């Protein structure tokens, strides 16, 4: 009977210790997932919705890995410096650009977001060989949804897969004929 009591005590101690360690691991994982979502939230607020381009680019240096890769409908963009050029170009084209996160879910090293992008196209959008001609400035306000998956490594954004409704945005701007689904000349806002 004494042996049974000792074994039972040992089993209880191990179970309590395991449960405590398991709870600690769950809390640690939850905290990491929340930090990852905070990184993505900060990117929306301080990079994409920041009207001060220089400030946005400084924050990008803090939030993105130097070898960051963006995968979107035009192909892949490699490196933070190329991504920062895209951020600056986007701000020049649409000075009032804003990306508002609507939902975020984190799992492992990834964060998935659903957001609403808005802005007024004040300058021409450069041609993308094989995808689109030069799109003249229309001065029209557009809003469109985006879905994105972000991979985070060591507290920084390492990779993004972006799924934006670019066709819808271009239709709103008057740059695509919605019946033919082809680019059309647009009246410039100059």
Regions found by a protein language model. Give the residues of each.
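C-terminal and inter-domain tail/linker signature
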Residues: 17-190
């Amino acid at each position: 009977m004494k042996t049974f009591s000792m074994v039972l005590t040992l089993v209880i101690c191990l179970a309590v210790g395991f449960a405590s360690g398991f709870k600690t691991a769950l809390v640690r994982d939850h905290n990491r997932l929340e930090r990852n979502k905070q990184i993505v939230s900060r990117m929306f607020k301080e990079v994409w919705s920041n009207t001060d381009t220089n400030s946005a680019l400084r924050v990008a240096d803090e939030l993105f890995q130097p070898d960051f890769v963006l995968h979107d409908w035009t192909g892949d963009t490699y490196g933070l410096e190329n991504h920062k050029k895209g951020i600056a170009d986007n701000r020049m084209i649409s000075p009032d650009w804003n990306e508002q996160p609507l939902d975020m879910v984190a799992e492992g090293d990834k964060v998935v977001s659903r957001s609403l992008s808005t802005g007024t196209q004040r300058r021409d959008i450069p041609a993308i060989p094989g995808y689109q001609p030069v799109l003249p400035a229309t001065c029209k306000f557009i809003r469109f949804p985006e879905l994105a998956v972000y991979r985070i490594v060591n507290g920084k954004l390492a990779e993004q897969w972006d799924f934006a409704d670019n066709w819808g945005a271009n239709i709103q701007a008057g740059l695509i004929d919605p019946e033919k689904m082809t680019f059309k000349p647009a009246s410039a806002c100059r």
